[in-house]
Structure formats: C-alpha cells, structure tokens
C-alpha cells in the first residue's frame, strides 16, 4: 500500500476538516477558529454554541478498514489538546466559560464521506 505524499495528506486532512465544519455549522455551531496553534499543539476546530466552547479534534480516513478514525486519538494527543485548549481560553479571555472536547470522525471523501460526531469524547481530567 502506497503512503500518500505530505502535500496529499494535508489536502486530504483539509477536506476532512471542511466536512467537520460543515457538519458543525449545520448543527448550529459557530466556528471561532480552525488550526489554532500554540506551543502546546494545534486545535483543529474551535466552535461555540450558546455559552459552550467546543474544542474539536478531527480525524479522517479514506476507509474504515483499519477501524474508526476516532480510535486514533491517543491519551497523549488528548493531553496536548487539553493544554492547547486551556491556553486558547486564556488567550481569548474566555475564562469561566463552559467547554467540552469532541471528536469528529470523517470516513471517505466528498459526497460519500460519513461524519460521526462524538460529543464529550474526552475530558480535561480536572
């Protein structure tokens, strides 16, 4: 099996994030940021609805042959997302707001892609 070139993987990842954003917006979420980075890592999507800020990790695979993409969010990745999210809340003066960590899995591409949203997929461990 051929491994995709970095540019091809990035393009594929962008398509997955686009599908996730379309899904969230259809559910009434407002996307605040995409691919926000700090020294702790990257936040794929930051969205809000009402008083809730949602930090979304997006995972994508071309097929489900190797399982659901959401299963690839390791504990170490969760910790990096939590640290980046706390930094985001501080940097954007959102302290005191309710927040949650979701995972969106995208399998396939284009119109045939399936999107699965897992609200509260992990927590901050506080």
UniProtKB/Swiss-Prot annotation:
Domain of life: Bacteria
Entries under SUPFAM superfamilies matching the protein: Restriction endonuclease-like
GO molecular function: nucleic acid binding
NCBIfam families: PRK12497.1-3, PRK12497.3-3, YraN family protein
Assigned protein family: Belongs to the UPF0102 family.
PANTHER family listed in its UniProt record: UPF0102 PROTEIN YRAN
Name of the protein: UPF0102 protein MXAN_3551
Protein species of origin: Myxococcus xanthus (strain DK1622)
Lineage: Bacteria, Pseudomonadati, Myxococcota, Myxococcia, Myxococcales
């Amino acid at each position: 099996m051929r491994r995709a070139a970095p540019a091809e993987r990035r393009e594929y990842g962008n398509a997955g994030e686009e599908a996730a954003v379309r899904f969230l917006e259809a559910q009434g979420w407002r996307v605040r940021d995409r691919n926000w980075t700090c020294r702790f890592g990257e936040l794929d999507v930051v969205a809000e609805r009402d008083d809730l800020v949602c930090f979304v990790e997006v995972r994508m695979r071309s097929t489900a042959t190797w399982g659901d993409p959401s299963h690839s969010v390791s504990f170490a990745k969760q910790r990096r997302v939590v640290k980046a999210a706390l930094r985001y809340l501080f940097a954007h003066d959102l302290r005191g707001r309710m927040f949650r960590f979701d995972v969106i899995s995208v399998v396939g591409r284009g119109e045939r892609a399936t999107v699965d949203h897992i609200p509260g997929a992990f927590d901050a461990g506080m």
